[in-house]
Amino acid sequence: MFKDIFKKNKKKKYVTVKNMTDTEVPEGIMAKCPKCQKIMYTKELQENLNVCFNCDHHMAMNAYDRIDALMDKGTFKELDKHVEPVNPLNFPNYEEKIEKDRAKTEIDEAVVTGWGTINGYKTGIAVMDSRFRMGSMGTVVGEKITRAIEYATKQQMPFIIFTASGGARMQEGILSLMQMAKVSVALNRHRETGLLYIAFMTHPTTGGVSASFASVGDINLAEPESLIGFAGRRIIEQTINEKLPDDFQTAEFLLDHGQLDKVVHRKEMKEVLTTILKLHQRGEN
C-alpha cells in the first residue's frame, strides 16, 4: 500500500519540446521595414534598391550597393581604398570600435570614393556609408573626399557626393572638424574651373556634414523623408522654447523652404542624375 502511494507521488519527467511556431529565420535572409514593420526577403529588397514594397520607405543602402545601382557596369574605379584611420588623440577604445565596424561592414572607412560613368557620362563620386561609425566624418573621410574632388578637378569631371552621416567624429576632435573646411575648399576650387558639383543627401545627413559640403552643391538633391539638419530637434525646441512642425528637418520640409532643388525617389536616382550630367555637358559645349 505504502509502495503504491510513493509510486503515485513519484516526480514526473518532462521532455522539453521545441516550440514549432517560432520560425527560425537565418540571419541575412529576411529584413524588416523600420517604418511599417513588413518582413521581406533580403534579396528581393536589395533588388528593389532597399525600398519597402509596402510603404515605399527608403531604407539604408550601403556604399557599394548604391554605386552598383548607379554607375555603369564595370566602369567604377575606386580611389584610396585602403587609407585607414588612426587614433591621433589616443581616444580610449577607438581602435577597437574601428576594427569592429571594419569586420561588420567589410569597408575600411565611412566613405567610398572613385570615378566612373553614369549612362556614359563620366563623373567623380563619393558615397558615405552610415554603417561605419554612423557615417561620421574623421580625418580619413575628409582626406578621401578631398583627394577624389582634386582628382575630378584634374580630370575635368563633375562630382557627386551622397551624404549619410551623424556629423563630425568626436573621437578625432578638432581634426575631424577641420575636414569641413578642407572639403569645402576643394569643392570651391573644383567649382572655379566651371565644373558641376551635385550634393545628394540621404538619411541621415546631420551635424558638421550638413553644415559643410552636403549643403553647398550647385544642385542639392535628397531622398524622400531623409533627416537633414545640424542640431537635433529637441535641442532646437529647448533653445527657442517652441514646438517645431512634425515634418521639420525632413527632405520635404527643406524642399518647401527652398533649401533643396528636388526630392528624388531612389528608383529615379540614375535617371535624374543622367539628365543633370547631360545638361552640364551640353553647357560646356
Swiss-Prot record:
- Segments forming domain CoA carboxyltransferase N-terminal: 29-285
Cofactor(s) needed for function: Zn(2+)
Q: Where are the zinc fingers (C4-type)?
A: 33-55
- Major subcellular location class: cytoplasm
Pfam families in UniProt: Carboxyl_trans, Zn_ribbon_ACC
Keyword list (alphabetical) reads: ATP-binding, Cytoplasm, Fatty acid biosynthesis, Fatty acid metabolism, Lipid biosynthesis, Lipid metabolism, Metal-binding, Nucleotide-binding, Transferase, Zinc, Zinc-finger
Recorded GO cellular component terms are: acetyl-CoA carboxylase complex
At which positions is Zn(2+) bound?
A: C33, C36, C52, C55
Class in the EC hierarchy, top level:
transferase
Isomerase is among the record's keywords? no
EC number(s): the record gives 2.1.3.15
GO biological process terms, semicolon-separated: fatty acid biosynthetic process; malonyl-CoA biosynthetic process
Q: Which PANTHER family does this entry report, sorted A to Z?
A: ACETYL-COENZYME A CARBOXYLASE CARBOXYL TRANSFERASE SUBUNIT BETA, CHLOROPLASTIC (PTHR42995:SF5)
- Identify its protein family: Belongs to the AccD/PCCB family.
On assembly, the entry states:
Acetyl-CoA carboxylase is a heterohexamer composed of biotin carboxyl carrier protein (AccB), biotin carboxylase (AccC) and two subunits each of ACCase subunit alpha (AccA) and ACCase subunit beta (AccD).
Q: What does this protein do?
A: Component of the acetyl coenzyme A carboxylase (ACC) complex. Biotin carboxylase (BC) catalyzes the carboxylation of biotin on its carrier protein (BCCP) and then the CO(2) group is transferred by the transcarboxylase to acetyl-CoA to form malonyl-CoA.
Protein name in the entry? Acetyl-coenzyme A carboxylase carboxyl transferase subunit beta
Q: Could you tell me which species this protein originates from?
A: Macrococcus caseolyticus (strain JCSC5402)
Q: What is the lineage of its organism?
A: Bacteria, Bacillati, Bacillota, Bacilli, Bacillales
| Gene behind this protein | accD
